Amino acid sequence: SEWIIKAVDKKDARPLWIAAWSGMNTLAQALWKVSHTRSPKDVDKFISKLRVYDILGQDDAGAWIAKNYPKLIYIRNKSVYGWPKDDEWYRKHVQEIGPLGKVYASRRWATEGDSPSFLYCINNGLNSPEHIDYGGWGGRFSCIRKENIESMDWVKKNNLDEMQYAPYLMYGASEEGGRAINIWTDDIHNDFMARMAWTVTNKYSDANHHP
């Protein structure tokens, strides 16, 4: 949480994207501390620099954040399945490519399941992160906040009650859902292959690069 605060406070006009691959308690702690140590004006300034991309919602802290900080740009994407390749693809094109590939772990659950949260911010000419309705490798989102987008089922099973914070508002996936990512599957993986090739290519001109 201290790192988040330090990163937001840097003299940098760019927004800070929080890619949430798990629970949101760390960001919640950062926001709580800032709220209890700064003026309302400075809290608003802090929040204005933050952007959140939450994969699936994996605890109840996201609902608490959305409820207590309604000015925060908060995306929760629950349409993130179906785009990764199979295990054989990752073995052939990643794990067998040089020293870096060797440390790429075999999956236990979903391969690259949370990756859309940072793929969304890759500057590939398709999207503009500040325009969530444009679409790109990380998906496309509604410009209208949706009410009470719930977390994964296991959050309820672990007796975490998001509805205590209802109503809370977040940006959610557009009507096309997971297809907004799935249509870019080949492009995402071609880019991944190229980057792996860079790790074993000594000369820049001998590898494939973007125009």
Where are these regions (language model features)?
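N-terminal acidic, glycine/proline-rich low-complexity segments
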Residues: 1-210
